[in-house]
Amino acid sequence: MSYIEELGIKAKAAEKSIATASTIQKNNALKAISTALIDNTSFIIEQNKLDLDNAVDSGMSKAMQDRLMLDERRIKAVSNSILTLTDMEDVIGSIDYGTIRPNGLRICKSRVPLGVIGIIYESRPNVTVDAATLCLKAGNAVILKGGKEAFNSNVCLINVMRKAVETVGLPADIVQLVEDTSRESTNELMKLNKYLDVLIPRGGAGLINAVIANATVPVIETGVGNCHVYVDDSADIEMAVEITDNAKTQRPSVCNAIENLLVHKDIAEEFLPKVKSVLDKHNVEIRGCEKTAQILGDSVTLADEKDFGTEFLDYIIAVKVVDSVEEAIAHVGKYGTNHSECIVTKSLQNAEKFQREVDAAAVYVNASTRFTDGEEFGFGAEIGISTQKLHARGPMGLKELTTVKYLINGNGQIR
């Protein structure tokens, strides 16, 4: 029996305990985890520093190091987000739909856990806690497979959480970590159909495409974020500058940050110098089309086809001047990843057209794409941003970690 199969067996054995746990017991487990994270802050930071030191030695970019880093403020924020989960309604057992048929049958559509969830993700250790606690609240067992970049942080966080859930009478194996960081273990996890009910990848295009291509377990695809802001000819320029700045520089290494800026030709000469002066403060590299280079000069690197389709996750942005809202929509359709897209405009007609015709999980008018987030949408923490159309789309909160069961009650009806 392999190591991965052993994890699957343990998760399946623990599944019933969490699936049938009361709301009070689940909330007590979450509170115990929240407290344990605060109590172990110094040790968590110490283990995280080992990962950060390795990241520096390996030449990891500053933006990606920021994704990896845990400090006292971030640990406290994660702890508080867990407490937010305890305040949220327990979706398990809730009724989506109910009816009484003409023959007297009472039919209800009820929410139940998915079962055992596998999650494969990269270098963000906060995902370890977010994913585990969301799965717990939704009544699921979880097997986590983090990236090797965050190995020490993840082992520490998992051990803290496993000890915490045991204090409230739940089995530690409702939360497990694959401590083998090899590609072989990832491939085996993708094929663990006997024990996993669903697999959720979180990370870059390479990881997600590999999971989609190789998994035999059902997959919920979460998003590569090649996101756009389109500045329409009627846009409020100051608003457009502020939205672009926030969407690109506030945290460039996350999937809801923009990678492309599209600007209507009639506003480009006024807008582009203003947005460049703001982006320059963050040392953002601009890769622009020929028209962009004509307006902004030699400081702009000429963009090629690849740039418009790249999720940089860094202080780099591709810029294109377009002739119309139709061209902007076509560009998004060609290069976008169905994640988050934005139009800045005063035109109600263009706003409605953009929201109607752009195919994405979240389509914004006059607001930053950085809001595509479970907390910001009022769902609590999220497991990821789904960019597919089956089962779930957009930020995946508690409800998206459940499925349905039909409950039918009769008094002897036969067909």
List each model region and its residues.
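Conserved C-terminal structural/oligomerization subdomain of aldehyde/semialdehyde dehydrogenase
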Residues: D304-R415
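Rossmann-like NAD(P) dinucleotide-binding subdomain of oxidoreductase/dehydrogenase enzymes
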Residues: D87, D96-E238
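Structural motif
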Residues: G115-I119, T133-L134, N140-V142, D173-Q176, ...
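ALDH superfamily catalytic-core signature
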Residues: S2, S123-N126, D130-K137, T167, ...
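N-terminal Rossmann-like NAD(P)+-binding subdomain of aldehyde/semialdehyde dehydrogenases
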Residues: M1-I107
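Flexible, glycine/charged-enriched surface loops at secondary-structure junctions
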Residues: A21-N27, G169-V175, Q250-A257, E285-K291, ...
